[in-house]
Structure formats: structure tokens, C-alpha cells
């Protein structure tokens, strides 16, 4: 008590007590902030745990490296990899987040055992309000694997043969009716157009003409509102009555009702639709326990089916168009490839035609390499995980983060990695990737939805790896290649200013996309 009385009697203390309450609060907060920064810095410098990965230095507790990471995740990963190596930890909104990059890091996280890592725990707060209840991350992993299997076995070669003409027709019809593509030339904000094209093509091909007939530009806007539910702040505030969450919830109810009404119509008719689309397949599916897939789960899986690919295909197709506007000569090469390999009359595209267009395939491959739609893939740690080849053990208090885009832009595997070069995928190119041989990368594993490649030896994983690898990989490739081929037949692109610059990337969402507006100049071929 004596010490406290002496401090209270100190002239500075008396001056502080005489200040207005507002100033006292301000000074108190400033002192608290300074002390927390000092203690945080001392903790990093003096009490580092040698059995855990190095910590990215940060001044403020809780905030940590959240801002620098959020501004430009790929640059953040590259800079800290150069400082700390392939495994390091940073503070993301108060949570210790351990990054493991490179092929070994990708394998460590993405092929982690179910007892060690968990995706559901991380993502359910984001996905459940968007997709709906009882599907994807709102159900046990075993059930999710069954749901993936239902959808995967419907994606047959025969189905793809029917998809390509549907996608081609949708692309042509879109450009005929769009007011932004009237006349012989003009300027268009291409990401908005590609978002609509990808939702129309996917809904028609995967979900049938009956569903497609209910889609228009307004429904595409509803899917955009659903997509905005994936904003990073929703990891913490998914429940809050924020404007984008209100739009998300309205969109989810509206879209789910469209699917539920269609399911009821089909049930009433005996589900005897002539089309073998995904909805018909799911309505006829049964879980291993003998329970038929409930209608609300069919509706929610239909939302997930489109949403899971929409942000990726929309972003990737936008980047492709922007790259073609940046390099018009590549667009002309694509056109001449079709003339040479398919015939000067450019007959209607077929699924088999896509295999005859290697540059068209490489355009998609190279764009996915440089513009990966998902820059961060997270997993909760369920049991302590030793990092192979190191002394580090990742505790359960950490979150794991994989960044496959880091290895996809690593000069050790891709010469001149920052150069967009679709010709690099040709065997005689000086920029040809230095990757594992096909035999080394063909290890297969069945997580419950069919054999998939582990991808553990590959630095190029545009569709992920492990049990959560994208089941729509082949559809996405067919969709993107068909869209590109049809656009090239119809248009010539260039940058509005005639230069060769490229717009920056928007990292505000969980999914990387071009900053908008991203305008290109288009001209119809004669």
C-alpha cells in the first residue's frame, strides 16, 4: 500500500488525475498499446520455441502479419520463405498460422491424414451459410466423400461429349444478345462478362436445360452475392448482420428455392427427364447406409457444385482474356491453330477437338499457373505434427496453410517463372517446366470417391491435392478450353491503350481475381 500511495502522490499522477476523463482514457490506451508492443517484441526475441517454426516478426499482438499478408499473399509468402525457409509461422487475427511451401509443404498439408488435419473446422463457417446445411463441410468427412463420389461418377467421358456443344452454344448466344458486344468493335469490362458466361455454361451443362432456363443475368448476380460470402472477415463475422451477409442469406434462400421447386416438379413427373444431368443423378443417389439423398441436400449440393467452380472458372477465364488482350499475337496463334487443325471452315467444336488444340490447352494451363484462384488453403491441426526433415512439431494450437502457387512460380521448377508463356509447355521450350516424371507423380489413393493422384511430387497443383482435391478438374478444363476456343473464333482483343500492361490482382476475397474494372478492346473477326 505504501508504494501505491507514493505513486499516487507523485506529481505526474496528480497531473493525470486532474485531466478530463477523455484524455485519461486516451493516455491509458496509449500506455497499454506501448506495453503490449514491447512485451510482444520481447516475447519474440527472448522466448522463441526451438521446436516450432520461426515466427514472422510483427509489432502488434493479435493483428500480427494480418495486414501485410492480406495485401498481397503471394509476395508475403515469397519474402518470408527467403527469410525463414519453407516452413514458418505468422499471426493471422490472433491465430498462429504455419505456412509450409514447396512440393514437400504441399504434400505435408494437403495429403495430411484425417486424424491430423481437418478442413471442415476451418471452412464450415464460410461454406454452410453459402451452400446450405448438411453438405460439404457441414457434415462428417465420410459423408462428404460420398457426396463427392455421387458428383464425380456423373462426370463421364460421354457426359463431356455432350457438354462441349452446350458450352459452345451458350458462349455464342451470350455474345449475340449482350449489349456490350453490339457492333463491330467496342470496350467491355471482361470479368463481369466472364462471370456470367461461366455460370450460364456450367448451369446448362451440369444441371440441364430446365435449370438453365431459370438462370438469367439477375440469377448470375445472386451467385455473385453468394460468392461475396467468402470474404475473409467472415471467418470471424459470418453471423453478423453485415450488408454482404444479408445479401448472401437472401441469395442462398432464393437459389435454394429454385432448386427445391425444380426437384418437386421432377418428383411429381417421376424424375423421368430425358437429360442425364447432375440433378437427376443426385435425386437417384443413395448413401451407403441406405438413405436416399434428401431433396434439400440435392438442392444444396447443386449450389455447391456451381459455387465450387464458379469463382475459379470466372477468375481464370477473365485472366485468360486479359492476357490475350495483353498479347494479341497469341490470340492470333490460337485462331490459326484452329484453322490448321480443325479446318478453315471452323466446324462446330466437339470434345475430341479440344485434344487437337495443344496451344489452347496450354493457355489454360499457364494461366492457372500464374493466376491461381486460391492463394491459401488452410487446415486445422488435430494432433501434433512433426515436419519431415526438420526438428519442428506443429502443435494443435496452430492452423496450417498451404500455398501451391508458391511452387508454381518457383524458378527451380519453372524457368522465368513470372513470364506468362503458354509455349513453355512445349517440350522444346527453354522455359519447359522441370517437374517430376509422370511415373513419379502417378501415386494414386482412394479417399472414398475414386482413385485420384496424390500430386505429392508436383510443384503444379492448380486443383489442389489429397482428399479435398477438386473433383471438377476435367470439367473445368473442358469448360475453359471451349470458352477460349469460341471467343478466339469470334474476336480479336487488345488492351484499351494498345500497350502490354496487365491489371493488378484483387486479394480482398479469399479468391484471387482481377481488379475491376478490367476493360479490354474487342473487335469482331470479319
UniProtKB/Swiss-Prot annotation:
TM regions (residue ranges): 27-47
Q: Which organism is it from?
A: Gibberella zeae (strain ATCC MYA-4620 / CBS 123657 / FGSC 9075 / NRRL 31084 / PH-1)
Where heme is bound, by residue?
Answer: 470
Functional description taken from the UniProt entry: Together with cyp51A and cyp51C, encodes the sterol 14alpha-demethylase that plays a critical role in the third module of ergosterol biosynthesis pathway, being ergosterol the major sterol component in fungal membranes that participates in a variety of functions. Essential for ascospore production. The third module or late pathway involves the ergosterol synthesis itself through consecutive reactions that mainly occur in the endoplasmic reticulum (ER) membrane. In filamentous fungi, during the initial step of this module, lanosterol (lanosta-8,24-dien-3beta-ol) can be metabolized to eburicol.
Q: Which family does it belong to?
A: Belongs to the cytochrome P450 family.
Q: Which GO terms describe its cellular component?
A: endoplasmic reticulum membrane
Entry EC number(s): 1.14.14.154
Cofactors? heme
Q: How does it sit in the membrane?
A: Single-pass membrane protein
A single GO molecular-function term is: monooxygenase activity
When this gene is knocked out, what is seen? Answer: Decreases the amounts of 4,4-dimethylergosta-8,14,24(28)-trienol, the product of the Fusarium sterol 14-alpha demethylases; and leads to the accumulation of eburicol and 2 additional 14-methylated sterols, 4,4,14-trimethylergosta-trienol and 4,4,14-trimethylergosta-dienol. Leads to reduced ability to produce conidia. Affects ergosterol production in the presence of ebuconazole or triadimefon. Host-induced gene silencing of the 3 genes encoding sterol C14-alpha-demethylase leads to strong resistance of host to Fusarium species.
Induction cue: Expression is positively regulated by the FgSR transcription factor that targets gene promoters containing 2 conserved CGAA repeat sequences.
Listed InterPro entries = CYP450_sterol_14alpha_dmase (IPR050529), Cyt_P450 (IPR001128), Cyt_P450_CS (IPR017972), Cyt_P450_E_grp-IV (IPR002403), Cyt_P450_sf (IPR036396)
- Tell me the keywords, alphabetical order: Endoplasmic reticulum, Heme, Iron, Lipid biosynthesis, Lipid metabolism, Membrane, Metal-binding, Monooxygenase, Oxidoreductase, Steroid biosynthesis, Steroid metabolism, Sterol biosynthesis, Sterol metabolism, Transmembrane, Transmembrane helix
Q: What is its main location?
A: endoplasmic reticulum
The top EC class, named as a word, is: oxidoreductase
Report further notes: In Fusarium, the biosynthesis pathway of the sterol precursors leading to the prevalent sterol ergosterol differs from yeast. The ringsystem of lanosterol in S.cerevisiae is firstly demethylised in three enzymatic steps leading to the intermediate zymosterol and secondly a methyl group is added to zymosterol by the sterol 24-C-methyltransferase to form fecosterol. In Fusarium, lanosterol is firstly transmethylated by the sterol 24-C-methyltransferase leading to the intermediate eburicol and secondly demethylated in three steps to form fecosterol.
Can you state which reaction this protein catalyses? a 14alpha-methyl steroid + 3 reduced [NADPH--hemoprotein reductase] + 3 O2 = a Delta(14) steroid + formate + 3 oxidized [NADPH--hemoprotein reductase] + 4 H2O + 4 H(+); a 14alpha-methyl steroid + reduced [NADPH--hemoprotein reductase] + O2 = a 14alpha-hydroxymethyl steroid + oxidized [NADPH--hemoprotein reductase] + H2O + H(+); a 14alpha-hydroxymethyl steroid + reduced [NADPH--hemoprotein reductase] + O2 = a 14alpha-formyl steroid + oxidized [NADPH--hemoprotein reductase] + 2 H2O + H(+); a 14alpha-formyl steroid + reduced [NADPH--hemoprotein reductase] + O2 = a Delta(14) steroid + formate + oxidized [NADPH--hemoprotein reductase] + H2O + 2 H(+)
Record-given protein name: Sterol 14-alpha demethylase CYP51A
Output the PROSITE patterns linked to this UniProt entry.
CYTOCHROME_P450 (PS00086)
* Pathway(s) it belongs to: Steroid metabolism; ergosterol biosynthesis
What is its subcellular localisation? Endoplasmic reticulum membrane
